[in-house]
Structures are given as structure tokens and as C-alpha cells.
């Protein structure tokens, strides 16, 4: 199931075979192994009859996967090929989570009950995941994070809501706009 590709179930339901791709490297850095796996899968996406790429708990459209892999040409990380960014409505707003950070030895991230738009929350989660992977970051319970000098978003470690195990929760809410008189 994916909000990125509405025809995913119908399309991949027609598959007649599959290829399992994996990269094993004793002592290899997870980022390097991940890049190699993306290159391998992206080359498969160039084949005429490929229907989808299953990774990070979802199916990606081959053209999306390939476009997302091409960022490596500029030295960027193919985070969209590694991490799924799940979004769902909750009683108090929109919530989101990552799925795939554990493949790099990192805890998954969740944002609960945000008052942002879904695309803003997805972009926020993307930026956090990219930051974690690009800088080999480790969060700790009680820390804060921000993308500006004044932004301090609390980080807590607790049982996952949308993901298994423990996850880091980041409180991400926009301040209400107050109208001046």
C-alpha cells in the first residue's frame, strides 16, 4: 500500500516472477552497501518488464525508484529509495513515521499529532532522515533538534506507535498565527 503510487496493488498483482537483490559486505559501511543496492535495483528498473520495486515495506513505481536513485550522481543520498515515509490522520492532526532507518542501525522517527500539512510533515521527516544518515547521527532521549537557531523541537524515546519497537518522537507543530489588532 502506498500513497505515492495509487495503481501499485493492481500493477504488481500481474507479476509472474521476482528478483531478490541483497548486498552483503563484511565490515562494509551500511551507507556504502545501501548505495550499491540502489544502483543494482535501479539497473533492474531500466528493464522493459519490471513492474515494481519492493523495499522499506512498500512497492515503488520503477520510474520513481530510478529518478530517486539518480540523485547519487550529484553526491546526494538516495533516501527516497531507502526510507518509506508513512503518513496517517490521527484524532489530533496528522502523524508520520519513517520505515527503513533501522537498516542503517538507526531508530525509526515518528511525529505524532502535527498540525502541519501532510506534504510539510513528509518533507520534515525526509530532512531529519537525510540529516541522520548523512551525518551518522545518534539521537538521545531529551535532546532537541531544529533547522534554525531558534527552533528547538523536543526528542523523546518511547515505544513506537506506528512502528515496531522503540522510536524517537519529535514534537513538530507549527505555532498558531496570531492576528494583530
Question: Which sequence ranges carry the predicted segments?
Answer:
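Aromatic/basic-lined ligand-recognition segments
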Residues: 58-181
Amino acid at each position: 500500500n502506498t500513497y505515492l503510487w495509487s495503481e501499485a496493488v493492481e500493477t504488481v498483482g500481474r507479476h509472474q516472477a521476482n528478483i531478490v537483490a541483497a548486498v552483503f559486505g563484511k565490515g562494509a559501511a551500511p551507507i556504502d552497501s545501501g548505495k550499491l543496492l540502489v544502483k543494482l535495483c535501479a539497473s533492474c528498473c531500466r528493464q522493459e518488464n519490471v513492474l515494481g520495486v519492493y523495499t522499506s515495506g512498500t512497492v515503488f513505481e520503477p520510474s520513481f525508484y530510478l529518478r530517486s536513485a539518480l540523485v547519487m550522481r550529484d553526491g546526494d543520498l538516495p533516501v527516497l529509495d531507502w526510507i518509506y515515509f508513512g503518513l496517517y490522520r490521527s484524532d489530533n492532526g496528522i502523524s508520520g513515521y519513517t520505515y527503513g532507518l533501522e537498516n542503517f542501525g538507526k531508530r525509526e522517527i515518528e511525529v505524532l499529532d502535527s498540525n502541519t500539512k501532510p506534504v510539510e510533515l513528509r518533507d520534515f521527516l525526509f530532512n531529519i532522515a537525510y540529516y541522520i544518515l548523512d551525518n551518522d547521527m545518534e539521537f538521545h532521549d531529551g535532546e532537541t533538534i531544529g533547522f534554525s537557531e531558534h527552533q528547538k523541537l523536543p526528542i523523546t524515546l518511547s515505544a513506537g506507535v506506528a512502528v515496531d519497537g522503540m522510536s524517537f518522537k519529535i514534537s513538530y507543530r507549527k505555532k498558531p498565527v496570531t492576528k494583530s489588532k
